[in-house]
Amino acid sequence: MAKVSVLNVAVLENPSPFHSPFRFEISFECSEALSDDLEWKIIYVGSAESEEFDQILDSVLVGPVPAGRHMFVFQADAPNPSLIPETDAVGVTVVLITCTYHGQEFIRVGYYVNNEYPDPELRENPPPKPDFSQLQRNILASNPRVTRFHINWDNNPDSLEAIENQDPNVDFSLSLSCTPVKSLGLPSCIPGLLPENSMDCI
């Protein structure tokens, strides 16, 4: 049984200019005290073509964590535009929030992100080179994809084999804040950005 349950993730200040920080309010509950830190990460998927363009925007250690409910605001700087392929700068991508314990990832929350020019003229006639200063970032907060993974919470060698034989599963009990946003008109190829074993969780 998982010792940490993520209760809620709220996307703050959305939509925002591309260069604005990402901000998420995360609530979670520990069924018992954790002696070691939880490591939270925000990862920006720079391109669906290769993980080499993924950017870890920030990583924070939280702990030791006592039993009970906890909440914090996780803020990370915007991705480095120079590391994003120009062909992937405008359009739909993904931002991930992950959490690990003892180096084992036990939850991943993914959001589709649409980067577009709010100026109609720029949308119709985009510049040859992406102008990130004019882009707006819109996170599809109403449609997160949540995947949970079985991990060895106690570092007990006897349970490692059993855990390795278990597949990731979807946690339908996770209640995430749903902030209505305009439809992003996701192209049919975009779902491949998120793991196949992840599903919509409302």
Swiss-Prot record:
Subcellular location, record wording: Nucleus; Cytoplasm, Cytosol
GO biological process: blastocyst hatching; nucleosome assembly
Result of knocking out the encoding gene: Mice are viable but display subfertility caused by altered gamete formation. The timing of meiotic entry and the subsequent gonad development is more severely impaired in female than in male mice. Increased perinatal lethality is also increased in the offspring of knockout females.
Processing after translation: Phosphorylated by TLK2. Phosphorylated by TLK1.
Tissue-specific expression: Highly expressed in germ cells. Restricted to premeiotic to meiotic stages during spermatogenesis.
Biological role: Histone chaperone that facilitates histone deposition and histone exchange and removal during nucleosome assembly and disassembly. Cooperates with chromatin assembly factor 1 (CAF-1) to promote replication-dependent chromatin assembly. Also involved in the nuclear import of the histone H3-H4 dimer together with importin-4 (IPO4): specifically recognizes and binds newly synthesized histones with the monomethylation of H3 'Lys-9' (H3K9me1) and diacetylation at 'Lys-5' and 'Lys-12' of H4 (H4K5ac and H4K12ac) marks in the cytosol.
Disulfide-bond pairs as recorded: none
Subunit record text: Interacts with histone H3 (via C-terminus), including histone H3.1, H3.2 and H3.3, and histone H4; the interaction with H3 is direct. Interacts with the CHAF1A, CHAF1B and RBBP4 subunits of the CAF-1 complex. Interacts with HAT1, NASP and TAF1. Found in a soluble complex with NASP and histones H3 and H4; the interaction with NASP is probably indirect and mediated by H3-H4. Interacts with CDAN1. Found in a cytosolic complex with CDAN1, ASF1A, IPO4 and histones H3.1 and H4. Interacts with CREBBP.
List of residues that carry Phosphoserine: S198
Residues covered by region (Interaction with histone H3 and CHAF1B): 1-156
Gene Ontology CC annotation, any one: cytosol
Keywords annotated in UniProt: Chaperone, Chromatin regulator, Cytoplasm, Nucleus, Phosphoprotein, Transcription, Transcription regulation
Protein name: Histone chaperone ASF1B
Superkingdom of this protein's organism: Eukaryota
Record family assignment: Belongs to the ASF1 family.
Organism, scientific name: Mus musculus
One function term, GO molecular function aspect: histone binding
InterPro entries: ASF1-like, ASF1-like_sf
